[in-house]
Regions:
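Extracellular/periplasmic head regions of type IV pilus-like filament subunits
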Residues: 2, 6-114, 118, 128-129, ...
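Low-complexity, Gly/Ser/Thr/Pro-rich intrinsically disordered linker/tail segments
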Residues: 69, 79, 139-159
């Protein structure tokens, strides 16, 4: 769960600066930046003097690999069960209306059981998606924590 909270903080940090110089603040649509760019939440240290929002320790992770036993996917909108109702986070090709993430165990029942979702609202939800969790998580297009998802208390410390 700490990883999804770190994602939330990194997105807030990312959107505090106009990263692409277009005059609009926006959220990152990917975790790893394109090499030589700052278009994701993590980029390798460079001579720009800017530290990536996910910090240097995240650099040990590899795109499409697990991090602390979990895999992650950024969602580009939310469904009717989300606070505020259904809408896209995108305006044109910019993700400026919000953000969300789904995290699921890389190896179900080995690295974890629960899957987690978080949005720009900062609420974390959890659910046991079962052994087919990866397939279900990859099929998700929107942050939509229906009644089958449980809100996690902010002071609950689990991974």
């Amino acid at each position: 769960m700490q990883s999804v909270l770190a994602y939330h903080d990194a997105q807030m940090d990312y959107a505090s600066v106009d990263r692409d110089g277009d005059g609009a603040l926006e959220y990152a649509q990917k975790i790893f930046s394109t090499p030589g760019k700052h278009d994701g939440l993590y980029w390798a240290q460079d001579d720009s003097g800017q530290i990536s929002p996910l910090g240097p320790s995240f650099g040990k992770a590899i795109a499409d690999e697990e991090w602390h036993g979990y895999r992650f996917r950024i969602l580009h909108g939310q469904g009717p069960s989300a606070p505020g109702g259904a809408y896209s986070y995108l305006i044109g090709d910019k993700m400026s209306r919000g953000f969300a993430l789904i995290a699921w165990p890389a190896k179900y029942n080995v690295t974890g059981v629960m899957s987690f979702m978080i949005s720009h609202e900062g609420q974390v939800f959890e659910k046991d998606l079962g052994p087919e969790g990866e397939k279900l998580a990859l099929a998700m297009k929107r942050f939509d924590p229906d009644d089958s998802w449980q809100e996690v208390a902010a002071d609950q410390d689990q991974e």
